[in-house]
């Protein structure tokens, strides 16, 4: 059992939660140190039994501290604090997915060298918890694929657009007002946050290094109400998915908007909730659902990791990197998928024949085609789904359509994922 104090970098989230308040009693923590920018500021939780300091290095260098909880976020200070703490022989618990996605390999290597624990359940969909499921619950399985909704902000936006027919910008403003999206929402709406998380899940699932830089990443900022209406008519829901999949010559790592059949359970996951589907050789397909962010979800995962250390559990999030297999990441152009395309074309005689002719020229079969009524500008809205084809081929089709005399707007392309 950990008998020495625990250092908490970043106080508000964990201390204000129910799980965080249980920390000192359930786990017999002797004391809790927290670095704060202003230790005289009024807090939303009781800090009377907590030793406060404005200098985080005072605590990571303190000889009587066993465990460091890093909850401040970012790359610079957080990385320096964690490196210092590890070198001083302290166990690490963090919720910092961006830091792990960009620097996790070197930090894990350092933790292994110093023989300390480096745990980060809260970094990905903290309320599920998916990392322990992959490492422990599915340890008898070979993981074939991981696919999920791992950013609650994006899921909230897409859900509201579908349910209320609102446009993207309008829902984004509401998400910011509700605190679901940051003032600068780039990480959430452009898929960067989800890509950080996917790179972590893939490394654990497949026993590789973290490869955030190789994740194909596309956000939801260009999804329109027209896309959602067409998808609904075709029997699909648009979800922003992170997908890691074993294929014959490597693994696919991709984050992008995806049409998912309404028959799939994951299509029913709405609002800020997260869900991850895992396909494995023994168990088959399993679904893990729960809140991915917020005070309680983060604190629940952080305190669970703390329990593991205090109770001397053998699980360690560094296990997935021991083999560090060299697995090729498939280039996005080579990935095969079914696709949805939305076109805006002039309503002239023979236009449908010209459109389908472009698909025929590329040897691509059309699975479904919907033409909506002509708008006030005498343009026709067309939605098409294809059979399985490479991304490179469908991008060539897009280029050919956009170069035609009848095209009136950029062609929208969205993956269709069967998740079978």
Predicted regions and their residues:
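Rossmann-fold NAD(P)-binding glycine/threonine-rich loop
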Residues: 72-88, 95-136
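A conserved regulatory-domain signal marking ACT and ACT-like small-molecule sensing domains
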Residues: 306-420
